[in-house]
From Swiss-Prot:
Its cofactor is FAD. Its EC number is 1.1.1.-. It comes from Aspergillus terreus (strain NIH 2624 / FGSC A1156). Pathway: Secondary metabolite biosynthesis. FAD-linked oxidoreductase; part of the gene cluster that mediates the biosynthesis of pyranterreones, a family of antioxidative compounds. The first step of pyranonigrins biosynthesis is performed by the hybrid PKS-NRPS synthetase pytA that condenses 4 malonyl-CoA units ato the acetyl starter unit by the modular PKS of pytA. The acyl chain is then connected to an L-serine through the amide bond by the modular NRPS of pytA. A tetramic acid is formed and released from the PKS-NRPS pytA to give pyranterreone 5 with the help of the thioesterase pytI. Pfam families: Abhydrolase_3, FAD_binding_4. Residues 1-18 form the signal peptide. Belongs to the oxygen-dependent FAD-linked oxidoreductase family. This is FAD-linked oxidoreductase pytB.
Length: 807
């Protein structure tokens, strides 16, 4: 493979030279490991570095400074101290299955815990204490020798800690619940080196967070206490259609039928370019019961499917079904060696040297599992929620997209039925979508890193899929399949309504190191917002507009100047959105250019300081300062103040501050796109029956109820402050003109409506545009489905801006 040559060596050398403390770090880690250190430490200069840093997924961008393979939990805290002394981050790795290689980040110390894989089963076989780094196949193999098992996932090489950190999606979950519901306790090493127990009674918030709230986020889990299960004999299903004509009717019927079946039946449909397949596990069911279920499904009436229905399958059969066997064999005859994985179970990469150390399987009475094949994995994850099912048109489009790729892509959709109706077991956990998900859609491609043209085609395909499907189904995604290119806020997409609680847990577990890490969660969202808008500039940016960035006191502005021939001489101040916690003038760059060109106005876009580091009223004061600077910098007597979402809230706040300062005549009008106008806790009592959108549209838009809660918590504005809850300001009547925009499926829909009513009552000249059925900020979505409505929005906005600008 081409990347194993001189370029790779040069890159590794760069890693070493970029971190002069790497020698000190190596010495520190060596002192922790003792005599076995040379066998358990990998540096960029070692021939095993490529193999060691990759994990399962072949990737090229993540180059850690050093990798340390722990064998005892007592080594973890000293390793964290080594990283802190060297001034770098310590990153835990269990299975190494992160599709984005987030378990092997640049410039970090990787603490690999795959050799923390002990299994101690209680005498009554009801519980087991296990090392958190054990791989699922090894766990099942060890438990099988005790005649018991664990409610876990399919892939044998996935590490337990990462699996449970994501929630524990499994093929028994519709009746038995997610894997995290079968965790009784854990031991966690925190950032300050303390090892604590997390359970329902001890550190319950931490126990909540580590189960579904993101692996490696709150500390390094080194041990789990699991509740074990004797899995009953079950019935297994495989249906296969090898013709393209059956793909749509089979997929449609499956999605209509499978999630609605009894909880004991868990299944998936695999959609390929030219065929489709259904796999199912009837937990505790008989062959006759499963056959009756399938006969009533309508699936057998579609085309000519090959049908396999097997009963009496023991646990080994069930776990191997669809992998090494397509039937249920007599006990003891099934080959379950696929589960007998070693701590480092992956295949070689090209001719590179593999890292091997203490690769001992859990069973010596069967062959060791064949190496798990690595490839350049490309993936997308979408939850379909119960209240927003796929339409036939959307389903057909997805099938057409899969069929459009070449055979080398090995593209497929792995779609699972969810609709979990059984009560949650154990104490609450951080997985956000258990009760809401109807189905999960995963799309996978084998990348082509050695073929730039094909790789570009695949990247564009996934990008287009994201832009098409995300606005349709929403942001909900499975955190086990993290996606750097997700087009929604990743925090709320993966953790839903639990984000703020998880941030609070993060603060506690980081102890004295909390502020930088908590802010990083929000900074990551900010970076994601900028990345999305730079990749999908809607409308296309007009490069003919000249720009200049100017730094003011504690903030900055970007000035957009129209060509002299088209200049109107007017000025508008634009304030970007982003929940007061993310964004910059960059995310509205294309919009500001369009306004400048089409209106002839000079646009001054404000870069204000963001929460949670800078809470209310810091950002507002920055915007006031920038507006006053604009009035003094340009030869105008008045200007328009405009913004979107949180930016619209700030625009109202600035205008009303100027009104109270006796400068109201300086503001021609306010243009407020989907504004936040009142804190939910400050809605007047007589208006509460009109303020229902927060819950009606809780999951129908990017700014979900959970996201809004998090934004409000981070910004920390007093609910009744008249410059935040601008609806309550007593001098609304002194605003000259206002333009408001409402989106019908927005959590902020009623903020706009209540503000409209208040302005009309105050006698303020008003223009109001409503977009029923459209989500928050829909005009910025990179979706052809929304293109016509987006263009209409921009035309209406420009007309309103011209009206506001008139004296």
């Amino acid at each position: 493979m081409r990347f194993l040559g001189i370029a790779a060596v040069a890159t590794f050398s760069t890693v070493v030279s970029a971190y002069p403390k790497s020698t000190a770090l190596y010495n520190c880690v060596s002192s922790v490991f003792g005599p076995s250190a040379p066998q358990r430490i990998v540096t960029p200069n070692d021939t095993t570095y490529l193999d060691s840093r990759l994990g399962e997924t072949i990737q090229f961008d993540e180059l850690p400074v050093l990798l340390a393979y722990a064998q005892e939990s007592k080594e973890i805290a000293p390793l964290i101290r080594c990283a802190k002394t060297a001034g770098i981050k310590a990153v835990p790795r269990a299975g190494g299955h992160s599709f984005e290689a987030y378990s092997a980040l640049n410039g970090t110390l990787i603490i690999d815990i795959a050799h923390l894989n002990y299994v101690n089963v209680s005498d009554d076989r009801q519980t087991a204490v296990v090392g958190a780094g054990i791989r699922l196949g090894a766990l099942y193999t060890a438990l099988s020798e005790h005649g018991t098992s664990f409610i876990g996932g399919i892939c044998p090489t996935v590490g337990l800690a990462g699996f449970l950190g994501s929630g524990g999606f499994n093929m028994q979950q519709r009746s038995q619940g997610l894997a995290v519901e079968h965790v009784l306790a854990a031991k966690v090493v925190l950032a300050d080196g303390r090892t604590v127990v997390a359970s329902p009674d001890t550190n319950p918030d931490l126990f909540f967070a580590i189960r579904g709230g993101g692996g490696g986020t709150y500390g390094i889990v080194v041990e789990f206490t699991l509740s074990l299960t004797s899995i009953p004999r079950s019935a297994m299903l495989m249906l296969s259609w090898n013709d393209t004509a059956s793909r749509f009717p089979a997929a449609k019927q499956y999605l209509d039928w499978a999630p609605k079946q009894i909880p004991e039946f868990m299944s998936q449909i695999n959609v390929y370019r030219d065929k489709v397949q259904v796999l199912g596990w009837y937990y505790g069911g008989t062959e006759d019961e499963l056959r009756s279920l399938v006969n009533a499904s309508g699936l057998l009436d579609i085309g000519k499917p090959a049908v396999v229905i097997a009963g009496g399958c023991n646990t080994d059969n069930a776990r191997a079904f669809g992998y090494t066997t397509m039937e249920c064999l007599p006990d003891g005859k099934v080959d379950v060696s696929i589960l007998n994985v070693v701590p480092d179970p992956f295949s070689k990469v090209g001719n590179s040297t593999q890292f091997k150390w203490n690769e001992v399987p859990k069973s010596t009475s069967m062959p060791v599992a064949d190496p798990w094949q690595r490839f350049h994995r490309m993936s997308k994850s979408f939850f379909v929620l119960k209240d927003n099912p796929l339409t036939d048109q959307t389903l057909q489009s997805l099938l057409d997209r899969i069929a459009s790729l070449d055979a080398k892509s090995q593209v497929w959709g792995e779609w699972h039925a969810w609709n979990i109706s059984t009560p949650s077991k154990g104490s609450g956990n951080a997985f956000a979508w258990r009760e809401k998900a109807y189905a999960h859609l995963e799309f996978q491609i084998h990348g082509a890193p050695d073929d730039k043209e094909r790789q570009s085609t695949y990247e564009n395909w996934l990008e287009d899929l994201e832009s098409y499907l995300r606005p349709t189904v929403g942001g909900a995604s499975y955190s086990g399949y993290l996606d750097a290119d997700i087009s929604t806020d990743p925090l709320t997409s993966y953790y839903g309504g639990n984000v703020c609680k998880l941030v609070s847990v993060k603060r506690k577990t980081e102890n004295d190191y909390s502020s930088s890490t908590v802010e990083q969660l929000f900074i990551d969202s900010d970076v994601n917002a900028r990345k999305i808008t730079s990749r999908y500039p809607i409308p296309p940016p007009d490069k003919s507009i000249k720009t200049e960035d100017i730094t003011l006191q504690d903030c900055w502005v970007r000035i957009y100047t129209p060509p002299s021939a088209t200049s109107s001489g007017s000025v508008a101040v634009f304030i970007h959105g982003g929940g007061w916690i993310m964004g910059s003038p960059d995310i509205e760059d294309a919009t500001c250019r369009r306004i400048c060109r089409c209106s002839g106005m000079t646009v001054v876009s404000v870069g204000y300081r963001l929460a949670p580091k800078f809470q209310f009223p810091t950002g507002l004061n920055d915007c006031v300062r920038a507006t006053l600077w604009t009035l003094g910098h340009f030869p105008v007597s008045a200007l328009v103040i405009m913004g979107g979402s949180a930016g619209a809230n700030l625009a109202f706040g600035v205008a009303l501050k100027l009104v109270d300062a006796g400068l109201g005549e300086k503001v021609k009008g306010v243009l407020a796109l989907v504004p936040a106008t009142v804190h939910p806790d400050a809605v007047p009592a007589d208006k509460r029956d009109q303020y229902t959108a927060m819950h009606e549209n809780a999951n129908n838009t990017v700014n979900t109820l959970a996201a809004m809660d998090c934004f409000l918590d981070a910004y920390a504005a007093p609910p009744h402050d008249k410059y935040f809850s601008v609806l309550l300001h007593p001098r609304l009547k002194d605003l000259k003109k206002v333009y408001l925009v409402e989106c019908g499926t927005d959590t902020l829909r009623d903020d706009a409506r209540l503000m409209r009513d208040a302005l009309e009552e105050a006698g303020v000249p008003l223009m109001y545009d409503a977009y029923p059925g459209y989500p928050h900020y829909f005009w910025s979505y990179p979706s052809p489905v929304l293109a016509e409505a987006s263009e209409s929005f921009h035309e209406n906005m420009l007309q309103a801006l011209a009206w506001l600008d008139q004296e």
